[in-house]
């Protein structure tokens, strides 16, 4: 394929969210896949970087950020969007690698839709439902999918409901986990084993979001399954995450040596098969497409398999499960990014 026939791919990363650094690392992996093998001829990459202040930067600056792995320092100029950098209007397919708010919540997907350009991943609805943990769990419930005990909490209840702590203790007990509804990579999440930790966890989560989720802590194995496709979805082999820390927090996820993965997970065939079917049902329940990672809790003693959450724009770093699960399923990085671009709509 000649360069004249190469499709221009807009690889957009960074973003004004707490997962900015993870996005840079994910984009570096995607860029590697786009420059490998036959993809070098198939695609011409236009890199676009969004800094922490929401400013958009063109190819030269974006490449510098990718090569250094470091976020761009704030130069004090006016924050927010001030126009597309050079090259954006040439882009034929957008490949968003933006994690967290303004990246995987339907906002950037809405912009691409307005631009009438195809893009990798879920559309506005699937992204928004998958991002908001309360909407996601409601969608899972409506589809009859198995979940652990939880309670939605509004930040306003921390002031208006004097019985909140007692109600949570009665309904869920300890340990429990407190999460903001709209952040990923375990940002703003805490574990509570007593009332003071519960109060502190609610305050922390409320500092990130007005919608919160409190979940019962369970003695489980943590499994993950990658899903790929549009109308026809396929599920990867299962992976298992183990960690030395008390729980799988942000530092554990992204610090070398604190967590380990086993791919494929050592599971009975019936459990693996059921998880793969449930993963596809979870993607359909929220209306996602393209790529998703579905996380499970497996209660080994009872054999129960519970859906924890879906991530419609999963991490793509060198230690992220999504690309590793597909590699173990016979889809290497080069082919994976190509398939995702082929699925763009």
Swiss-Prot record:
It comes from Synechococcus sp. (strain RCC307). The keyword RNA-binding does not apply. Mg(2+) 2 binds at residues 309, 311. Pathway: Cell wall biogenesis; peptidoglycan biosynthesis. Its EC number is 6.3.2.4. GO terms for biological process: cell wall organization; peptidoglycan biosynthetic process; regulation of cell shape. Cell wall formation. Its cofactor is Mg(2+); Mn(2+). This is D-alanine--D-alanine ligase. It comes from the Bacteria. The keyword Cytoplasm applies.
